[in-house]
């Protein structure tokens, strides 16, 4: 019951519906103009890419007909082989296909489009023309060319700089394996770009954010492998044996961690809107390719270095014997710190609610309305905005509840109002240009209906709940003990609440990327936790006979200490990527990156200081086989 249309280069939102045409105005004609079929006999139309007999790429529209349409189309095409059957939409011929053969199966292929975008446009026109209803606007967004190009270029620059910094970091910390990781990372990035190109996935700003995040996460598998190799060398194994054992022992942690993150990406794909789905697609591609490059490409490069003569253990490093840190002794201090931070968030939300504001700074995606962002070319104080700009907006819109915010480190101002009609958006656009000499190419509009905003709120809650349940089931299945899963999930809830505190206290807009941010943090945090739990599982297997509380505490502390450097290094590399996005990205990307950075810090903290400690408490106090001694 909805159609999403993206039209590059169109800057007048008021004319888009008119340009799309009228529903129900699609006709299929014979060459003499006789109408033999109308749009109500069309079931679907989708753009696709195929290859001809010579291997050349073709852009086509796959047409699916109803049963009645299939019968009519079969009869007409049987009688008109070699003739053209024009497709007329809104009074104009939009395609002039020639019948190659009788089409009786209810599906047809319209070829001849020069680009995939052209095929998409034709498919959209056919779908809209086949509707027997009236179109109404649920959501529209117009982005000025200047803002769009700036956002894309700054995000790509952030990715490139972050990638180089991460490569240098890996080489400094891990020597020869670090060089292998850097080369694998370059191959990984090329594979991601090639995949996006081959599957013609539209690259949105959240999609770029997903790529940058996945680059940071791709390093994690290499860090786990290299840490294992160093441990094997320290235990007296030869370099070649250490490499074989290192990859083998790292396998379970890499698979478990990436699969749980993949669960979050799949939930996003199922419940997210268009922009969030773009993030989910790139994140999912990144996760799959990161596992491939770490387990296959890095292995191949590392073995190549070995057979080229780099066989001395000094090239690979040796794990140092570390004194076990007694993390669990401070468990109640950690719990108290977390409770205090989360309580501060709830108190902040209560204060906002008591002062007549929303507990969270809901954006249009969650509240509905129209957001207008324009570059005014000079700095305005809050008083100037209230005295000069808001009265002009009020005059045009008649809205008495107008919110205006400055975009940090720019001369842009965002104005939030009730939902504006196309005519009102036009009037506001002209008024801003006339009154403040605003360049119209910098003005962007985004409108969300109450229908869409209500669904987004529901989807946000649903996405978190579904992904959490799926992760709990997976961890329970893999670790054979629900206490592992329960402690991991409580740690995830802890991370969500802490990030919610950041949103509440810093008044960051809770919008479309909020869902992506939360699920990314969930996936990232559980990945970190699983690596530690995997080590606990391994160390527990070394303990034979009856286990005491002291045994459990010793295993937990030793596992945390053994994985500490990996947790720190992975957090640093991932943080670098997101920090570059925050540093160089446009305002909307920074609003996504800031809570994501907070979530990553919190995720590292919870996996080290909360999850394992909770597991220990549950192990000694809960369950049939709880340890009482």
Predicted regions located by residue number:
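A structural signal for conserved, well-ordered secondary-structure elements
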Residues: 1-629
């Amino acid at each position: 019951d909805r159609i999403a249309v993206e039209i590059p280069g169109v800057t007048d939102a008021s004319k888009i519906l008119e340009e799309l045409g009228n529903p129900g105005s699609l006709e299929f004609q014979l060459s003499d103009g006789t109408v033999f079929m109308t749009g109500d006999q069309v079931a679907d139309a989708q753009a696709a890419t195929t290859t001809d007999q010579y291997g050349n790429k073709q852009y086509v529209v796959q047409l699916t007909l109803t049963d009645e349409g299939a019968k009519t189309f079969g009869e007409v095409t049987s009688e008109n082989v070699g003739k053209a059957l024009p497709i007329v939409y809104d009074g104009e011929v939009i395609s002039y296909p020639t019948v190659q053969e009788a089409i009786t199966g209810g599906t047809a292929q319209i070829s001849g489009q020069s680009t995939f975008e052209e095929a998409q446009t034709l498919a959209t026109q056919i779908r809209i023309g086949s509707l027997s209803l009236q179109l109404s606007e649920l959501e529209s967004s117009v982005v000025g060319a200047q803002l769009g190009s700036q956002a894309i270029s700054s995000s790509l620059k952030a990715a490139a700089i972050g990638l180089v910094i991460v490569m240098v970091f890996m080489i400094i910390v891990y020597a020869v394996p670090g060089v292998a990781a850097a080369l694998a990372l370059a191959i990984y990035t090329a594979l991601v770009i090639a995949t996006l190109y081959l599957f013609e996935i539209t690259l949105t700003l959240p999609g770029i954010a997903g790529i940058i995040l996945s680059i940071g996460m791709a390093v994690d598998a290499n860090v786990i492998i290299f840490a294992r190799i160093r441990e094997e060398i320290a235990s007296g194994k030869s370099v070649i044996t250490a490499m074989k054992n290192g990859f083998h022992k790292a396998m379970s942690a890499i698979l478990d961690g990436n699969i749980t993150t993949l669960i979050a990406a799949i939930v996003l794909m199922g419940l997210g809107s268009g922009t969030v789905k773009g993030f989910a697609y790139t994140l999912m591609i990144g996760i799959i390719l990161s596992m491939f490059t770490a387990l296959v490409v890095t292995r191949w490069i590392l073995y190549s270095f070995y057979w080229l003569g780099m066989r001395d253990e000094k090239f690979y490093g040796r794990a140092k014997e570390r004194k076990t840190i007694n993390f669990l002794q401070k468990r109640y201090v950690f719990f108290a710190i977390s409770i205090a931070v989360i309580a501060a968030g709830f108190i902040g939300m209560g204060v906002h609610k008591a002062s007549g504001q929303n507990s969270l700074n809901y954006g249009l995606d969650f509240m509905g309305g129209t957001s207008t962002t324009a570059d005014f070319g000079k700095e305005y104080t809050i008083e100037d905005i209230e005295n000069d700009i808001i009265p002009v907006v009020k005059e045009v819109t008649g809205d008495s509840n107008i919110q205006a915010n400055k975009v940090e480190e720019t001369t842009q101002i965002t104005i939030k109002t009730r939902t504006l009609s196309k005519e009102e958006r036009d009037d506001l656009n002209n008024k801003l240009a006339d009154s403040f000499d605003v360049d119209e190419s910098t003005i962007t509009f985004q409108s969300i209906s109450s229908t869409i905003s209500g669904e987004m709120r529901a989807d946000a809650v649903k996405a978190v709940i579904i992904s959490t349940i799926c992760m709990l089931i997976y961890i329970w299945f893999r670790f054979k003990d629900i206490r592992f899963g329960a402690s991991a999930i409580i740690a995830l809830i802890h991370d969500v609440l802490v990030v919610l505190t950041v949103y509440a206290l810093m008044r960051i807009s809770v919008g479309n990327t909020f869902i992506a941010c939360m699920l990314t943090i969930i996936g990232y945090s559980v990945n970190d936790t699983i690596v530690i739990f995997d080590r606990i599982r391994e160390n527990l297997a070394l303990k034979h006979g009856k286990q005491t509380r002291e045994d459990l505490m010793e295993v937990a502390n030793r596992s945390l200490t053994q994985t500490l450097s990996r947790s720190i290094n992975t957090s640093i590399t991932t943080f670098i990527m997101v920090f570059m996005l925050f540093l160089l990205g446009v305002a909307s990307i920074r609003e996504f990156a800031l809570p994501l950075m907070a979530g990553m810090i919190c995720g590292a903290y919870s996996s080290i200081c909360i999850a394992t400690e909770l597991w220990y408490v549950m192990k000694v106090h809960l369950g049939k086989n709880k340890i009482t001694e």
